[in-house]
Amino acid sequence: MYFSNCMHKLNKMLIVALAAMGFASANAQTTLPGSIQEAVKENVSAKAVMENIMTRTSVRKFKQQPVEDVKIEALLRAGMAAPTANDMQPWHFVVLKDKQDIEKYAESNKYHAEDIKKTPLFIFVCADTTRMAEGQGKELWVQDLSAVSENILLAAHAMGLGACWTTIYPIQKKVNGISRTLNLPDNLIPLNGIIIGYPDEPEQPKDKWDTKKITYGIPN
C-alpha cells in the first residue's frame, strides 16, 4: 500500500509537470515503442508517465540559468515520495545552488572543477545512519536511496531539466573527500551527487531494450 501511494503521488506530479510544458503529447507516437503504445493507449496519464521514463537520459552540460526554488522543492518532494524498506526513510539531502558553495565544491575536485562551476544545481543524496535497519538489512539504504535518486531524475526530466547521477558510494575515497568538503556529520553517508540544470543542447536517449537479458519462468 505504501509503495502504491508513493507511486500515485509521483505520477500525479509528473503528469502536472508534463501537461504544463506540453510535453505529454509531443512526439508520443514516435518515441514510444509499439508495445508500450498498445499498453497505455487508453490511459493518458500512463502514456505521459511512460513517455517521461522512455525519453529521460543523462545530461551533463547545462545553460547558465538557475533552477527555480519551486522546482528544487518539487525535486526533493519527488525524492521523498520513494518507497523505503520498513518505511525507514533514511534520507538526507544536501543542496548546493549558490555560486559560492558550488565554487567551494569545485575547489575540492581539481579534475572536474570547471565543469562543476558550470553546474547550476547539485543535490547530494545521503543516508542517515541513525535511520537504518539492523542486522542483515543494514545495507538496504542503498536500494532505498537509489529509488529516491531515480524519482529525482524523472521529476527533473518532467520539468524540462536535465540531470545526471554521479557516483560517490561505495568508493571510499570519494565518500571521505565529499564528506569533508560538505562538512557532513558522521551519521551521513553520501550515495551520489545529482547534477541538475537546463540542458545546453538536446540529448537523445539510448535504446537499451534487449530481450536476451530477460528470462521468463524458472529454467529447467
Regions found by a protein language model. Name each.
Residues 2-17, 26-220:
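Acidic, surface-exposed loops and disordered segments
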